[in-house]
């Protein structure tokens, strides 16, 4: 009979509270992603101000229903300008949503109730209205670059009211 695996300690379960981004294992780093896919939306930068504008157009590799990459392992080959998040760049990427777990941990803040590491449920990011599910209007390549300005939206920079709650609504 196989030994029953030991339950991780509370400290191990809450690794994002005790470790820096640099100290995290590869598995911990990957699990920090909440699966919202907001970072997978096409963005435009104003040449005059440097301000970043989100659109509701997804990367060509985005599975808009699952809110994940269709080929995560090969994303950089298929989309050369895909930004691979690292402990160094999450501190400098101004376009990361304020709700992004990488950004929160880098700023010394805790995760929201809807984050799968907190809730234990990968669907809470969708229930809270944080993910892009149901909001993507098209994918890269379906809309011309000239038309992208017509698809600028503000919601990716905002946090829905129910997501701001201290705990999961009943």
From Swiss-Prot:
InterPro entries, A to Z: Puta_zinc/iron-chelating_dom (IPR005358), UCP006173 (IPR008228)
Highest taxon, organism lineage: Bacteria
Recorded family membership: Belongs to the UPF0260 family.
HAMAP family named among the record's database cross-references: UPF0260
Protein's name according to its UniProt entry: UPF0260 protein RPE_1881
């Amino acid at each position: 009979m196989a030994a029953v695996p030991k339950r991780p300690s509370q400290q191990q379960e809450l690794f994002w509270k005790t470790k820096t981004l640099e100290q995290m294992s590869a598995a911990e780093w990957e699990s920090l992603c909440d699966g919202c896919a907001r970072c997978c939306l096409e963005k435009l930068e104003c040449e005059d101000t440097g301000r970043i504008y989100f659109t509701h157009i997804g990367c060509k590799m985005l599975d808009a229903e699952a809110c994940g990459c269709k080929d995560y392992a090969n994303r950089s080959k298929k989309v050369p300008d895909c930004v691979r998040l690292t402990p160094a760049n999450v501190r400098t990427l101004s376009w990361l949503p304020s709700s992004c777990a990488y950004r929160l941990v880098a700023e010394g803040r805790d995760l929201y109730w809807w984050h799968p590491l907190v809730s234990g449920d990968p669907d809470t990011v969708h229930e809270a209205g944080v993910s892009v599910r149901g909001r993507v209007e098209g994918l890269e390549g379906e809309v011309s670059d000239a038309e992208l300005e017509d698809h600028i939206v503000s919601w990716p920079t905002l946090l829905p009211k129910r997501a701001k709650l201290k705990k999961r609504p009943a």
